[in-house]
């Protein structure tokens, strides 16, 4: 990609082609070396200026990475009440913020019953599933929590639903979760359907593709 005259272009053999929208998964800091990390080789110089002018769309938009911080889980129900003045129809899973001493003490004392996650983690990396972890793994996590409590949250282990999945042994149940998508323009709406992620490893509850997870088509029987 390159920038010219306030627009973004894709380089092609036949000549440059104007780009209307960019789907990105890299961090904000790497988007534009003129605005953020100056040594970035992933971004496009001047991209941020084009975006601010409205000449190109970026999905996910700069700034939306705040939703990737797992500490925000603790505030979901409060945000619904604050912005919509409604009670959530589906309650957020109870979330303990280890940066709060009372929460940290509870997590350390009950780590064998909880799932501990790094607040800035992704791809299922760094997660400790307390009921399945060894004593040594739990002790190592406790040391990490004590060292940098603000880097971790914890939640009760939720029992995920299962779906029939073809394996080497035949059709077997595998754990899954459903990730819906909310689109926002002049108004906001939830898409019909979503991304169903499946833990392909037997007994696993980690659905992330980077950890061996897969995906399935999502069929909405009744709306």
Question: Where would I find each of the regions flagged by the language model?
Answer:
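Active-site nucleotide/adenylate-binding loops and adjacent lid/helix of ATP-dependent enzymes
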Residues: 14-20, 24-160
